[in-house]
Amino acid sequence: MENGNGAITNGHVNGNGMDFCMKTEDPLYWGIAAEAMTGSHLDEVKKMVAEYRKPVVKLGGETLTISQVAAISARDGSGVTVELSEAARAGVKASSDWVMDSMNKGTDSYGVTTGFGATSHRRTKQGGALQKELIRFLNAGIFGNGSDNTLPHSATRAAMLVRINTLLQGYSGIRFEILEAITKFLNQNITPCLPLRGTITASGDLVPLSYIAGLLTGRPNSKAVGPTGVILSPEEAFKLAGVEGGFFELQPKEGLALVNGTAVGSGMASMVLFEANILAVLAEVMSAIFAEVMQGKPEFTDHLTHKLKHHPGQIEAAAIMEHILDGSAYVKAAQKLHEMDPLQKPKQDRYALRTSPQWLGPQIEVIRSSTKMIEREINSVNDNPLIDVSRNKAIHGGNFQGTPIGMSMDNTRLAIAAIGKLMFAQFSELVNDFYNNGLPSNLSGGRNPSLDYGFKGAEIAMASYCSELQFLANPVTNHVQSAEQHNQDVNSLGLISSRKTSEAVEILKLMSTTFLVGLCQAIDLRHLEENLKSTVKNTVSSVAKRVLTMGVNGELHPSRFCEKDLLRFVDREYIFAYIDDPCSATYPLMQKLRQTLVEHALKNGDNERNMNTSIFQKIATFEDELKALLPKEVESARAALESGNPAIPNRIEECRSYPLYKFVRKELGIEYLTGEKVTSPGEEFDKVFIAMSKGEIIDPLLECLESWNGAPLPIC
């Protein structure tokens, strides 16, 4: 039978209409959890992005996503608003009314008539005063001067959204009007100031959440930040938000409902995971670009290899890389190179390239699993006691224990550190001319390598980033301390772990930024390499034809057969090993060209005795003409490329990875770095990092994969 508050009084349905007596085929929710993991990770990321960009977040208690939390936290109230489900009002009111009725009947209930935690043996009939004291003693945070000890406003906004969502489910005993007030604060971009530290996320995030309650109740020590960054008093905050009726006098249980939840930890975890999912996909695509510029062998993505390993994250990572590399102009060129000279490089690529799917796959699985765990948490009812109107009772439990947050954040941080470790290994190969298959040391792009040290500083910075990231990978959750007179003797440290994971994400963005700019530099160096090699070949061929074809009397000369071997050497020699001074006798070009001519002369037999048929006699003339012509031709080719008129276009434009290159070079205007320019690497890295932090990299990243059908290429 339904009472006037919309609650079933003789069944097991609360005011929100949830019937827990109904039989279900999945009573333990393992099926729901498994179903949430179906489909590809990339499709899930695309869905996240689409949801992130919606202008309205509609809260009903059970459908909140990490994308919506990230949107509210990042967009500061501009372009996105929160709406509360009117259907939830009855359930919220029913639980609030139940608490008041219970209090009036003299029913003993934790946090309503009792003290808190280890001192819950104390009793009082002053329910409102008890809630007021709860907020007072929990306001134990330290802010100091400045904002160093204040929780970032984005994380506070996330916490506010998550807490509203929890309380909307009607099990907490709080008035709907309080939830509407918090919503107005969000929509008007008025953010309470919460302490950065001071919570162990069990019983919930008591200390930081008490400052939201402090603002709602008008505590004089409460502060908020307005839309323009101005510090507001509670009175100013209420006025600006349009909250009418003055400060709230908390009714029994309402203070506890506001503070006894995991919203701060899970809110920040949601923000972190939104970015972690994007960065995981970026790592997959950048690994494929790394294979392109390193002239890697694409067979490392072959589906059979990964099918036999069985791990879905690995299979998807390999399929994504395979898609990027399929038809790549770099892969085609590399295949020709390997066929021409199979001994020029090792039979197998190094682990950072060849095992990148095996390395990234488990990290993606961990991040995806953590995402689902946090998504369940932000839709959970996590305070205590829970008000079960249907059974006319308050249930004392421990849903405030934020273990899912602490564990998922520890695991996510470990995955982020592993992604960073791979990125560092790849970057280290990229800048090292002993490993990078012909690219210049440090990716130096200028004419004079003695005055151009390219990405050397960036490599040092990457080592620093990676070291700090590996340190952060250490778990937080094994540092639990017994708290609150040994009542809270195990606790989750959820927010601490979320904060450390947020730091890890920032560092991974620094590494991703540096690596992406390095990859773009390598792409342009391959373009330069191709143009310069073509110029050298054409010049050597031209001089060979002019000098080596004919004898002094116009007859065909034996040296005419040298040209093919001369050009074969030019093909095989790394261009950046000599191009800064191509005709230097100490560099390999002139040495190998002379060696080739000498070898032909030694095979020329008795012809060498005749001045008219001697190949030895041609060497000096050949070298002199080459010295006169080649430096000019090389400089001309460089100048043409720098002016945007290269003889050979950039292969990247034919590749699926082009959108990321285009984003860096054209949309952000990041320069090709050389020692000849004034611009430092850090100035350019900053632009990419800022854009990445704003989410501007998402569209070009997804554009690289827009034609992927979600499956690996068939095994033929």
From Swiss-Prot:
The keyword Cytoplasm is annotated on this UniProt entry: yes
TM spans (from-to): none
GO BP annotations, alphabetical order: cinnamic acid biosynthetic process; L-phenylalanine catabolic process
EC number(s) on file: 4.3.1.24
UniProt: (E)-cinnamate binding residues: 260, 348, 354, 384, 456, 484, 487
Site of covalent link 5-imidazolinone (Ala-Gly): 202-204
Molecular function GO terms recorded: phenylalanine ammonia-lyase activity
Main location: cytoplasm
Keyword Cell cycle: no
Positions of post-translational 2,3-didehydroalanine (Ser) modification: 203
Pathway: Phenylpropanoid metabolism; trans-cinnamate biosynthesis; trans-cinnamate from L-phenylalanine: step 1/1
Post-translational modifications: Contains an active site 4-methylidene-imidazol-5-one (MIO), which is formed autocatalytically by cyclization and dehydration of residues Ala-Ser-Gly.
Keywords of the record: Cytoplasm, Lyase, Phenylalanine catabolism, Phenylpropanoid metabolism
Top enzyme class: lyase
InterPro entries for the chain: Aromatic_Lyase, Fumarase/histidase_N, L-Aspartase-like, Phe/His_NH3-lyase_AS, Phe_NH3-lyase, Phe_NH3-lyase_shielding_dom_sf
Active site residues of this protein: 110
Catalysed conversion reaction: L-phenylalanine = (E)-cinnamate + NH4(+)
A GO CC term attached to the entry: cytoplasm
Subcellular localization(s) per the UniProt record: Cytoplasm
Subunit structure: Homotetramer.
Family: Belongs to the PAL/histidase family.
NCBIfam families according to UniProt: phe_am_lyase
Function, as annotated: This is a key enzyme of plant metabolism catalyzing the first reaction in the biosynthesis from L-phenylalanine of a wide variety of natural products based on the phenylpropane skeleton.
Protein name: Phenylalanine ammonia-lyase 2
Organism: Petroselinum crispum
